[in-house]
Amino acid sequence: MTMARFQTYLKDSDVVVTIHRGIDQIGGCITEISTKTSRVFVDFGQNLPGCTVPTTPEQDKALVRDIFAQNVKQHQAVVYTHAHEDHVGLFDLIPCDVPQYIGVGGQELMLAKYDLLKIAHEQEWKDSEEKSKILIDDEQKIRKIKDFHIWERTAPHTRPKSFMIGDIRITPFFNSHSIYDSYMFLIEADGKRIWHTGDYRDHGYLGKGLYPTLHRYASNIDLLITEGTTLKRGDLCIQESEVSRRMACVMSAFKYVIVLASATDIERLASVKTAALKARKGLYYTGGMMGRAMRIFTHREAKKSKGLFDFHFKYVGEDDSKFGEMQKKGFVLVTGASHLDFVKKMCQGLSSSEVLLIYSAWDGYYKDPLQVKQNPAYRDFREAFPNVVDIHTSGHASRECIKKVIDIVKPKEVICIHKEAGAEL
């Protein structure tokens, strides 16, 4: 397995920046920033299906082992921009003596995910030696996540607290992405200033803080490391508020509405909620992760957001007594792609002409043959409904947004990662 690697030395300093993975692929990014005594890795992600050559668990272990065997420093750590698998997916392979850092919201989402996986494994697997190994592995992952060092998001117009890894200073800055609690980093070492954007956008509800943050804090930047996910895609990046407006229009035209969306995207769930309220529809959800995520969002963000991120959807499960009321009054049901069988059962007896699926996810999941081969769930969900409308916007920066970020920051050097091979700024 070959892997494109890029390295640059910052002038008049001991700072070395190594892109172990991500210079020619979306996801699976691993960036190393080192000095004579210290090094910090930004993200240790799992490769995304369909975006590069798949790796086996053995190859992942060898990759992590080889990276940590080289350039060993007295002070080492991994910091995560957010909790998507293509950024945190190799966390369980990081050596135990290397501390890992993430925002508290990201930690809570990871704990929710792996706790639910453990519950599913307990219920689905018959007692056996193999089941015991799986549950032990689940427990080890949960313990490792609990051991993460965490930071809290600061209030608006307040400088975030920095932390030190040896002689490297890291300051996390909250941003908008398609998952809750996503961050950029200002990384300072040996007189040099590096701005790592992680994944970001300016068209979400939380995206309004992007440019003011850059104007205020991203000055005298020697190196800007930015994502470039959309550079070859040409994604149409409408505002999240426009997503909600379009949803409200079609929700008003159908009695029964299913919304296929990510459980961890706080801004998309807010769009669904706002649209359903405008359309005067009852709000429901199914799926354990959806419920846990909304409780995290409500607990942490309801008051700060003045109610925008206050979620009180009603839960719907198997043989639920709510079915009768829902069929009578109509509904909006938010769900994930793994719950198709339940949703089909719930829609039995309903007139298909009154049922609409709002597909609110990346269209590549059902259009790209490689994506469909890896996971056909999104395509299958879409094909199960005669009435379907796509209403979505990217969780990533548009080409115009990336250009504006570069223009504001005015870095001495730019490295673009998290992009397809051949994509150019």
Regions found by a protein language model. Give the residues of each.
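His/Asp/Glu-rich metal-coordinating catalytic cores
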Residues: T2-A77, D86-E267, S271-K278, G282-T286, ...
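Short, charged/polar "capping" segments at the starts of alpha-helices
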Residues: G50, E108-L111, E267, M290-R295, ...
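Short acidic, S/G/P-rich loop/turn micro-motifs used as interaction or catalytic elements
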Residues: L231-K232, S338-V343, D363-K367, G422
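Hard-cation-handling environments
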Residues: R233-E354, I358, R382-A384, C401, ...
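Histidine/acidic-residue-rich catalytic or RNA/ligand-binding cores of hydrolases
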Residues: F297, L370-P376, R399-K403
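Mobile, glycine- and charge-enriched loop segments
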Residues: S352-I358, Y366-G395
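Internal alpha/beta domain cores that form substrate/cofactor-binding pockets in large enzymes
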Residues: Y365-D368, V388-L425
